[in-house]
Amino acid sequence: MRLKNKPWANELVEEHPESALDRPNPAEKIDWAARFGNDKPIEIEVGSGKGQFITTLAKQHPDRNFVAMEIQKTAAGIILKKKLDEGLDNLQILCADAANLVAYFGENSTSKIYLNFSDPWPKSRHEKRRLTYKDFLAKYQAVLTGDGLIEFKTDNSGLFAYSVKSMNNYGMHFDFMSVDLHHESEEIVEKNVETEYEHKFASKGQPIYCLHAGFLAK
C-alpha cells in the first residue's frame, strides 16, 4: 500500500546517509560490514512498510544485523526515524527495488529473508511482479547462505496458494506452514512478530497465512 508523501521523511533519509541508502547504484557493491561495523549475520525484510516488524526484530536480536528494504522513500524515512529514536545500530535502511537484490547484497551474504504482506498482484499479466515468482526466488537463493530461509506471511489466500506452488516447483523445502498462524500453538503465537498490517487484519478475524522455506544445497 502506497503511503501519502511526507516531505520530512524524505528529508530524513537524505540527512542520514550513514543509516539509509537511497537508491544506490547497483553497479557499486555495498560494504555492509563497514556500514554495520561488524560482520554479524544479515537478515533482510523486503518491503518493510512502516517498520514495526523489522524494528521489533532488531530490538529483540542485538546479535544480528537487519536491513529494511523498502522502495517507498516516505516509508523508508518513517523506519529511519524509529531506528534513530530507538538507537538501533543493528538496523540499516535500503530504499531500493528488490529486483536489484543480488547487486546490493552479493551471493551467500544473508541468513534470512522476510516477505511480509507483499502486494499480491492478482492479475495474471502481473505475475512476474509477485515477490514469490520464480525469478525472485532465484535472487533469494543467490543471496542466502546454504541453510538460509525465507519467512513469508500474507492475508491473501490466493497469493499464499500461488507462493506454495511456485516454491514447490522451484524445488524448495518447507520447514513450517500454517493457514491460520494466530491460532497455532501458544509457543508459535508468542514467537510471532506482527507487522502493522497483520495486527489490523488479524484483530478482525482474518486468517494469516505463513510459511518458512529453504533451498536445496547449492
Curated annotation (Swiss-Prot):
CDD domains given in the database record: AdoMet_MTases (cd02440)
- Out of the domains of life, which is the source? Bacteria
Binding residues for substrate: 123, 155, 195-198
Can you tell me where the transmembrane regions are?
none
Q: For S-adenosyl-L-methionine, which residues are the binding ones?
A: 45, 70, 97, 119
Family annotation (PROSITE patterns) = SAM_MT_TRMB (PS51625)
EC number(s)? 2.1.1.33
Please verify whether the record's keywords include Plastid: no
Specify whether S-adenosyl-L-methionine is a keyword of the entry: yes
Q: Sorted alphabetically, which InterPro entries does this protein's record hold?
A: SAM-dependent_MTases_sf (IPR029063), tRNA_(Gua-N-7)_MeTrfase_Trmb (IPR003358), tRNA_methyltr_TrmB_bact (IPR055361)
Which residue ranges does the record annotate as region Interaction with RNA?
125-130
Q: Name one GO molecular function term.
A: tRNA (guanine(46)-N7)-methyltransferase activity
* Pathway stated in the Swiss-Prot or TrEMBL entry: tRNA modification; N(7)-methylguanine-tRNA biosynthesis
Q: Where is this region: Disordered?
A: 1-25
The catalytic site is made up of 119
Amino acid composition bias (Basic and acidic residues), ranges on this chain:
13-25
Q: Which reaction does it catalyse?
A: guanosine(46) in tRNA + S-adenosyl-L-methionine = N(7)-methylguanosine(46) in tRNA + S-adenosyl-L-homocysteine
Mind telling me which PANTHER family this protein's record contains?
A: 3-DEOXY-D-MANNO-OCTULOSONIC-ACID TRANSFERASE/TRNA GUANINE-N 7 - -METHYLTRANSFERASE, PENTACOTRIPEPTIDE-REPEAT REGION OF PRORP DOMAIN-CONTAINING PROTEIN
**Which NCBIfam families does this entry report, sorted A to Z?**
PRK00121.2-2, tRNA (guanosine(46)-N7)-methyltransferase TrmB
Q: What does this protein do?
A: Catalyzes the formation of N(7)-methylguanine at position 46 (m7G46) in tRNA.
**Annotated family:** Belongs to the class I-like SAM-binding methyltransferase superfamily. TrmB family.
Q: What is this protein called?
A: tRNA (guanine-N(7)-)-methyltransferase
Organism equals Lactobacillus delbrueckii subsp. bulgaricus (strain ATCC BAA-365 / Lb-18)
Q: What is the lineage of its organism?
A: Bacteria, Bacillati, Bacillota, Bacilli, Lactobacillales
Gene that encodes it: trmB
